[in-house]
Design a protein with these regions (language model features):
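Short amphipathic alpha-helix with an adjacent loop that forms part of the alpha/beta core around
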Residues: 70-82
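Hydrophobic beta-strand scaffold residues
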Residues: 30, 62-63, 107, 135
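Structural motif
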Residues: 5, 84-85
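N-terminal Rossmann-like dinucleotide-binding module
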Residues: 1-43
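Donor/substrate-binding cores of folate-linked one-carbon enzymes
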Residues: 85-144
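Short, structured coil segments at secondary-structure junctions
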Residues: 26, 59, 102-103
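Short acidic-hydrophobic, aromatic-tinged amphipathic segments that line or gate anion-handling sites
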Residues: 63-69
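N-terminal beta-loop-helix "entrance" segment that forms/cooperates
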Residues: 37-59
């Protein structure tokens, strides 16, 4: 069986286990990672790579860091083959309809809390703040 191609969009530590799991799965090939640009962190304002970028480079996966994915999407899409799936885990930007229609099979979002109670960011922190006795993860196909 041919491996399904994935473009992975994610940024924080929360997204790294999902990226690693997809890379380890023999049914998938993560061909590209898209993450937020490196940002100044701390008092020293040291330029720091997002955790997903660090993991992707360790795994040998090419990384793109557009400031605004929607604005740069046409250039990105023209430079690589359409993936079977676009997997988004805590990427940090709203995606345009053009981005959502890019994958051949589906754009998939992994959200850090069960929907609909856990809408928005940061879902895990909201669960703790509201004293939720349990929480979960929502996996959904994005359409709009």
């Amino acid at each position: 069986m041919e491996k399904r191609s994935i473009v992975f969009c994610g940024t924080p530590d929360f997204a790294v286990p999902s990226l690693r799991a997809l890379v380890q799965d023999k049914n998938f090939n993560v061909s590209l990672v898209i993450t937020q640009p490196d940002r100044p962190v701390g008092r020293s304002k040291e330029l720091t790579a997002p955790p997903v970028k660090t993991a992707a480079l360790e795994l040998g996966i090419p990384v793109l860091q557009p400031e605004k994915l929607n604005a740069e999407f046409a250039t990105i899409a023209a430079s690589i083959d359409r993936p079977d799936f676009l997997v988004v885990v805590a990427y940090g930007q709203l995606l345009s309809q053009a981005v959502l229609e890019w994958p051949l099979i589906a754009p998939i979002n992994v959200h850090g809390r069960r929907l609909a109670r856990g809408r928005g960011a940061p879902p895990i922190e909201h669960a703790v703040l509201h004293g939720d006795a349990e929480t979960g993860i929502a996996v959904q196909r994005m359409v709009k």
